[in-house]
Amino acid sequence: MRADTRDFRALFLGDAPLLDTRAPVEFAKGAFPGAVNLPLMSDAERHKVGLCYKQQGQDAAIALGHRLVSGAVKAERVAAWAAFAQAHPEGYLYCFRGGLRSQISQAWLREEAGIAYPRVIGGYKAMRGFLLETIEQAIAECGFVVLGGMTGTGKTDVLRQLDHGLDLEAHAHHRGSSFGKHATGQPAQIDFDNRLAIDILKKRAAGCRQFVVEDESQAIGSCSLPFGLYQGMQRYPVVWLEDTQPARVQRILRDYVIDLCGEFTALHGEQDGFGLYAARLRQSLDNIARRLGGERHRRLAALMDEALARQAGDGSVDAHRAWIEPLLTEYYDPMYAYQRQAKAARIVFTGDHQEVLDYLRGPGRALP
């Protein structure tokens, strides 16, 4: 039998299959990428055992757990674990702290199914602690460069072409602006942290000593950046990306109209999907109504409605340029110009896509 492990680094670098025996409610609050939740106890069973533990102590709680998970219920859960173990012989199982739940699951697998399957010592809590420490170590030990630029310049496009780029928006599943929501929801905060940490771990293992991050607010939608990283981003050197106005409009059209519509229609079908997409686009504009001002919001909303009507009629998206262009020039550009001025002393390079890529791939990688 493979030994139980506490080598968290190897687990995450190797994308080891992980069998999570915590209750569904625990799993929903945060998990590791690719982990499969096959719980020892349901949420209701866990709640009953927890009450028993508080009122009568550990022995009584363990006895109740064995009564609740017995017979056909036990056989069904062991069968699910056995199927996972057979499909993923290189995997591991764990519970919250690496204690009784994973030990019981491990013992039942061995006794009932004849499968010796290793567990993670310390469980979810220890693995989560390791990942948070991974982020903190990177902030303390690595160099960071912030990639800035006006809305629509393609900062994310550049970032994804860099081996040492950390795509915070991808981990948050959000494009980082008032229009940044996707058709599907964002991960839990814990999931965001875990994804970012594993990305950092793998890139450092591949030899990265410096990272490039996109200029972001402290929150990307509902996901907050690690506090130490956000603090650092207020002092790290900045590389400023520039592009032409037509190219920026085209990129916004691609991301927030063409791609977003495609996401909704793929999930919900042409008719329902288009309706949900149109509602999302209108809501995104409404979210900044107060900052736009009443008259400007009404003007842009009317242009958006006209563009949506034309898109619904013949599939054309060109009319969306009529609201995208003034949204950039009248709202986003003045805001970003102010931010650029505030960062002026930290800007170490300015250029177009290829120039910025060449600079960030160079031996100095923007370190002052």
Curated annotation (Swiss-Prot):
NCBIfam families assigned to the protein according to its UniProt record, in alphabetical order: PRK11784.1-2 (NF008750), PRK11784.1-3 (NF008751), tRNA_sel_U_synt (TIGR03167)
Record-linked SUPFAM superfamilies: Rhodanese/Cell cycle control phosphatase
Active site per the UniProt annotation: 95 (s-selanylcysteine intermediate)
EC annotation from Swiss-Prot or TrEMBL: 2.9.1.3
Residue ranges that the Swiss-Prot or TrEMBL entry lists as coiled coil: none
This protein's UniProt keywords: Selenium, Transferase
Record family assignment: Belongs to the SelU family.
Reaction catalysis annotation: 5-methylaminomethyl-2-thiouridine(34) in tRNA + selenophosphate + (2E)-geranyl diphosphate + H2O + H(+) = 5-methylaminomethyl-2-selenouridine(34) in tRNA + (2E)-thiogeraniol + phosphate + diphosphate; 5-methylaminomethyl-2-thiouridine(34) in tRNA + (2E)-geranyl diphosphate = 5-methylaminomethyl-S-(2E)-geranyl-thiouridine(34) in tRNA + diphosphate; 5-methylaminomethyl-S-(2E)-geranyl-thiouridine(34) in tRNA + selenophosphate + H(+) = 5-methylaminomethyl-2-(Se-phospho)selenouridine(34) in tRNA + (2E)-thiogeraniol; 5-methylaminomethyl-2-(Se-phospho)selenouridine(34) in tRNA + H2O = 5-methylaminomethyl-2-selenouridine(34) in tRNA + phosphate
Subunit structure: Monomer.
Protein name: tRNA 2-selenouridine synthase
Function: Involved in the post-transcriptional modification of the uridine at the wobble position (U34) of tRNA(Lys), tRNA(Glu) and tRNA(Gln). Catalyzes the conversion of 2-thiouridine (S2U-RNA) to 2-selenouridine (Se2U-RNA). Acts in a two-step process involving geranylation of 2-thiouridine (S2U) to S-geranyl-2-thiouridine (geS2U) and subsequent selenation of the latter derivative to 2-selenouridine (Se2U) in the tRNA chain.
Residues of the Rhodanese domain: 12-136
Gene Ontology biological process terms, A to Z: tRNA wobble uridine modification
A GO term, aspect molecular function: tRNA 2-selenouridine synthase activity
The keyword Transferase appears for this protein: yes
